[in-house]
Amino acid sequence: MKEKLTIIKVGGKIVEEESTLNQLLADFSAIEGYKLLVHGGGRSATRLAAQLGIESKMVNGRRITDAETLKVVTMVYGGLVNKNIVAGLQAKGVNAIGLTGADMNVIRSVKRPVKDVDYGFVGDVEKVNAGFLAALIRQGIVPVMAPLTHDGKGSMLNTNADTIAGETAKALASLFDVTLVYCFEKKGVLRDENDDDSVIPVITPEEFKEFVAQGIIQGGMIPKLENSFSAIDAGVSQVVITLASAINEGSGTVIKK
């Protein structure tokens, strides 16, 4: 029987505010068994870029990562945000280690090819070093992963944190009984976006298609759910979309086959 592993993905909005970060770290610390945290950090990067006189360019909500911006996100994601989380977890007795994809070749990516938009130094994940992560986890060490990967040729790459969480979950699914939790600003996937209590408790692939056709699920939630079903297909036991403050409550939307 596989040992349980919980992978939590949190956005920058949560980890950049002291009050919400402290609550998250307390809730994360209370998770029993093996665990791993993946974080974002976009607003901090935007702020530092502005202070340095570097313009932040976004297309469809995605950051364009030119050479100067890459320096900023590497400093912020791999440094400031990541180490604040690690220090906070250590203070709560959690033996955490901060990682980017370059550390021990944890995640190697390929630079995204230019199609309609040139996103610059943005990585699409090629390989996750599951063996190394599993070795850390089984020693009781908790990986805290920044949204940065590398190309194996000496360059860092800015990489979507949702993608890192999903690909890491898939890679570890053969070794652990993995639950992947995407922390969201809502209580889960909503039947009515104007009613915060209209949470859909369970979504199957068939229901997902119906909800999209009916316009109940739309926009950025569609790729999030597509990634969730991809993780399930790759052997992840369960994917949950819920509030960051509810990761120990068993609430939210569960994605199932």
UniProtKB/Swiss-Prot annotation:
It is found in: Cytoplasm. The keyword Transferase applies. GO terms for biological process: arginine biosynthetic process via ornithine; L-arginine biosynthetic process. It is an enzyme of class 2 (transferase). Gene3D superfamilies: Acetylglutamate kinase-like. Substrate binds at G41, G42, R63, N158. One of its GO terms (molecular function) is acetylglutamate kinase activity. It catalyses: N-acetyl-L-glutamate + ATP = N-acetyl-L-glutamyl 5-phosphate + ADP. Catalyzes the ATP-dependent phosphorylation of N-acetyl-L-glutamate. Belongs to the acetylglutamate kinase family. ArgB subfamily. PANTHER family: N-ACETYLGLUTAMATE SYNTHASE, N-ACETYLGLUTAMATE SYNTHASE, MITOCHONDRIAL. This is Acetylglutamate kinase. It comes from Phocaeicola vulgatus (strain ATCC 8482 / DSM 1447 / JCM 5826 / CCUG 4940 / NBRC 14291 / NCTC 11154) (Bacteroides vulgatus). The gene is argB.
